[in-house]
Amino acid sequence: MPDPDSTLAARLLRIRGRVQGVSYRASAQREAQRLGLSGWVRNRHDGSVEALVCGPADTVERFIAWAHVGPPAASVSAIEVGDAAPTDGAGFDCLPTC
């Protein structure tokens, strides 16, 4: 049986609430880098933030827990989480708004 700590996961998050204009993307990038995750984060035109987070399953879950709170100025009202295909690269990027 595989060690659950070594199981890789990729999750696509859509974060809603007051999450733009409050440094949510920059904070998410710092948190993902601190945790050693790969992926990206970007603003959406509908006012939400979207993130693709890849790494060990337990660490991805820790990022998701952080995302429910976000930086101090944010007010997260909801997060949708879905499975995703992992990214090909390393690092965690802030992408342009889409």
UniProtKB/Swiss-Prot annotation:
Residue intervals passing through the bilayer: none
Reactions catalysed according to its record: an acyl phosphate + H2O = a carboxylate + phosphate + H(+)
InterPro entries in the record: Acylphosphatase, Acylphosphatase-like_dom, Acylphosphatase-like_dom_sf, Acylphosphatase_CS
Gene3D superfamilies associated with the record: 3.30.70.100
Domain (Acylphosphatase-like) ranges: 10-96
Lipid biosynthesis recorded as keyword: no
Its EC number(s): 3.6.1.7
Molecular-function GO terms, alphabetical: acylphosphatase activity
Catalytic machinery residues: R25, N43
Keywords, comma-separated and alphabetical: Hydrolase
Pfam family, one: Acylphosphatase
Family: Belongs to the acylphosphatase family.
PANTHER family: ACYLPHOSPHATASE (PTHR47268:SF4)
Protein's recorded name: Acylphosphatase
Organism: Azoarcus sp. (strain BH72)
Taxonomy of the source species: Bacteria, Pseudomonadati, Pseudomonadota, Betaproteobacteria, Rhodocyclales
Gene behind this protein: acyP
